[in-house]
Amino acid sequence: MININVKENMRLKTKTDYCIRVLIYLQSHEGRVKIQDIAQSYGISKNHLSVAVNKLAELKYIITTQGPKGGIEFNKEAQNKTLSELISQLEDFQIVECFDPESNTCTISAHCRLKGMLNKANSAFLNELKKYKIKDLS
């Protein structure tokens, strides 16, 4: 019998959660805000939140400004991107070993149906999230 621990495997990474929280916060606050303010609001370490902020900046969901009057703000050009697009950029969705051909050592993967089932589940999840835009978060 195949045992899939949904609590462990079908879960977004903490970084993805923090990225979504940052976007929600920024959409509900006008102008530039400090990472520290967001960290305090959510009770999250500033250092951990900074990792999410850097990723969002790299993906162009937010705009960062350095210096004493610096901070971060929502990139309005990202508001029409879908949640599916965001989460696909942040997650690898390699739920089981056979999803990664480079590290797959499973001896039954050529005959196993599980990979197809999980691919369908992932597709359904991402297709559902295509219905929602980043602007819908707040």
Question: Could you say what each language-model-derived stretch is?
Answer:
Residues A52-A57:
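Basic amphipathic alpha-helical segments that dock to polyanions
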